[in-house]
């Protein structure tokens, strides 16, 4: 399915840097942009109110907040248990302790059902394999497998679009700047695992990744923007 044949999309929207950047881009490309936000009792659940505020500010077609508290009961993680401190070290299985097992499986499944009911042709998600937090459900192969499962399971053409898949964090900042929304993304989104809007706590892994990307972009704007254009043109990982 080509982007030209898509007019209505559902954006998996957390209110963070990545999903907000995807939402901003989608508003320039599609006739109807519907956001869906998931409340799973997350540690940083302030992001839900941030998502509501941004949805209104950006005037998207509709915004739905869905209760998926069952995920909190099933998945033990630093993002679902306040008693588990967020760690910079990997667990024995090689994953960060902020990994929520099954989260993107559930989110994309529910977004797919919602897209089916709306008659949307695509789901947009801000997952990224190039410069990510080590989550297996952010990988390209996973997304393609989920897309195939949704298409086969619902007998409907449905594309999962991943605008950030092969971008690093600096390029993601450049993408927001390309649409004249760098300040909005910097100051009004919530990426911090401790629930602090904007630049965040500065200590958690999410804040470190976000800050490093921003500093790289601000120090090398022309170079990063050029690399963004190349990555966007090829749609493939950059070597």
Swiss-Prot record:
Cofactor: Zn(2+)
InterPro entries, per the entry: QueC, Rossmann-like_a/b/a_fold
Enzyme nomenclature, EC number: 6.3.4.20
Pathway recorded for this protein: Purine metabolism; 7-cyano-7-deazaguanine biosynthesis
Keywords tagged on the record: ATP-binding, Ligase, Metal-binding, Nucleotide-binding, Queuosine biosynthesis, Zinc
CDD domains for the chain: QueC-like
Cofactor note: Binds 1 zinc ion per subunit.
Cross-referenced NCBIfam families: 7-cyano-7-deazaguanine synthase QueC, PRK11106.1
Family from the record: Belongs to the QueC family.
Function: Catalyzes the ATP-dependent conversion of 7-carboxy-7-deazaguanine (CDG) to 7-cyano-7-deazaguanine (preQ(0)).
Record's protein name: 7-cyano-7-deazaguanine synthase
Organism: Shewanella sp. (strain MR-4)
Gene: queC
């Amino acid at each position: 399915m080509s982007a030209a044949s898509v007019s209505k999309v559902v954006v998996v929207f957390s209110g963070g840097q990545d999903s907000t950047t995807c939402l901003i881009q989608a508003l320039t490309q599609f006739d109807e942009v519907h956001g869906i936000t998931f409340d799973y009792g997350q540690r940083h659940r302030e992001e839900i109110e941030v998502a509501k505020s941004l949805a209104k500010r950006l005037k998207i077609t509709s915004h739905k907040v869905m209760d998926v508290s069952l995920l909190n009961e099933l998945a033990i993680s630093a993002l679902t248990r306040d008693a588990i401190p967020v760690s910079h070290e990997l667990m024995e299985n090689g994953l960060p302790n902020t990994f929520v097992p099954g989260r993107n499986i559930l989110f994309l499944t529910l977004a797919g059902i919602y897209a089916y009911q709306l008659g949307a042709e695509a789901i947009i998600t801000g997952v990224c394999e190039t410069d990510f937090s080590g989550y297996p459900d952010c990988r390209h192969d996973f997304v393609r497998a989920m897309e195939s499962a949704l298409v086969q399971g619902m007998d409907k053409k449905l594309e999962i679009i991943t605008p950030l898949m092969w971008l690093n964090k600096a390029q993601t900042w450049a993408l927001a700047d390309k649409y004249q929304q760098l300040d909005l993304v910097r100051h009004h989104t919530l990426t911090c695992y401790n629930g602090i809007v904007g630049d965040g706590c500065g200590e958690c892994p999410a804040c470190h990744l976000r800050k490093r990307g921003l500093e790289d972009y601000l120090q090398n704007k022309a170079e990063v923007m050029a690399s963004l254009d190349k990555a966007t043109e090829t749609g493939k990982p950059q070597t």
